[in-house]
Amino acid sequence: MKKILQSIVFKRLSWTVLFLFIYVLGSHLVLPFIDLKHPKLLGGLSNSIAFTSAMMGGNLSSFSLFSVGLSPWMSAMILWQMFSFSKKSGLSKLPIEIQDRRKMYLTFAIALIQSLAVSLSLPIEVGIPKGLAILTNTILLIAGTFFLVWLSDLNSFFGIGGSIVILMASMVANLPRQIGESITRLHIGLPIILSLIIMGLLFLYIAVIVQRARYRIPINKVNIHNRFSQYSYLDVMLTPAGGMPFMYAISLVSIPQYLLILIQILFPKNSWTNTWIEALTVGHPIWLVLYQVVLFVLGIAFAFVNVSGEQIAERMRKSGEYIYNVYPGPDTSRYINKVVMKFAVIGAIYTVIMAGGPMMIVLINPQYLQLSMIPGMFLIYSGMVYNVREEIAAMTLNESYKGLFD
């Protein structure tokens, strides 16, 4: 028992439990000046926005400090990565401190748009100045987003899982309830529920198999005897991007709708905003096309974020490693990028089929939205659990050895 209490996993897990408690506590801190008895609490915000917010650490249905969640930060990270791909921008050459500061500026801009859209849509109590209520709630929502970013950083440093744990907590707390409400609302019988469970387990099995699949590139190390060469290789996942495209695509695609809702509230006479808000609502044809295109693009982009040929080639050159029949340096970088590109396309197609394909059912009935996202959630869950498992395995590696005089 003493050994367990002193283990690094237990200590880090204790910190993570504390951070999750703080997150749950903040999720129950309701924003001020809101008329909770109003029949249309979300105002211009659709239920689909509330649902997608729950997948990114937010909860619009509770009108709490963390209603916007980590969505602005996630959107800022993917936009920054896209900007950094261009060598002409020079963003990747900036000092880390400046990069982090500009990422926070971008996060603030996106958080301002989303928080203002939410605040303007909420019904205000009678007798409260509307301007004061909107300003206060906007500031609180932005502060809530940055607090979650800070909490995620603390969890990365002291706990287990980083921001992944916050997202998992949000999904576990909100999505089962919303899926249950969908089943009740659609009057789905027991046979269909059992079929959905079986299909869900099948999707989970496929997701786990694909998550563990690897392509191994043989690596040779200078001054290492050849009989050890079988243990030297570079792993490339079958889906190098993992489940990240699904999560980030939802965050990225929701930004235009927040922006349009904000324009509609500020300029109610513009008729075109209603048309585009309706077109970009989750489950509509234009949204589905945009979502699947973003899924595919992010599937390729994140593959090169996770497996960078340039960084690996530079690290191999410094450590005296090389790939058989490939010259070190630029040739190694091009070879690795070529391999990654092949699997990135395979992974992007797999992600579109697994996460985007089932959502085509909402064209028949939009009320199937929550159920159609179950396969995508399995992709996220499998990736999250695998990452946490790898992190725990790395932390317990040193503890698996015994001291010489123990």
UniProtKB/Swiss-Prot annotation:
It is found in: Cell membrane. Keywords: Cell membrane, Membrane, Protein transport, Translocation, Transmembrane, Transmembrane helix, Transport. The keyword Lipoprotein does not apply. It comes from the Bacteria. The chain crosses the membrane at residues 14-34, 63-83, 108-128, 131-151, 156-176, 190-210, 246-266, 285-305, 344-364, 368-388. GO terms for biological process: intracellular protein transmembrane transport; protein targeting. SUPFAM superfamilies: Preprotein translocase SecY subunit. GO terms for cellular component: plasma membrane. InterPro entries: SecY/SEC61-alpha (IPR002208), SecY2 (IPR014269), SecY_dom_sf (IPR023201). Its main location: membrane. It is a multi-pass membrane protein. Component of the accessory SecA2/SecY2 protein translocase complex required to export cell wall proteins. May form heterotrimers with SecE and SecG subunits. Part of the accessory SecA2/SecY2 system specifically required for export of possible cell wall proteins. The central subunit of a protein translocation channel. Belongs to the SecY/SEC61-alpha family. SecY2 subfamily. HAMAP family: SecY2 (MF_01466). PANTHER family: SECY/SEC61-ALPHA FAMILY MEMBER (PTHR10906). This is Accessory Sec system protein translocase subunit SecY2. It comes from Streptococcus salivarius (strain CCHSS3). The gene is secY2.
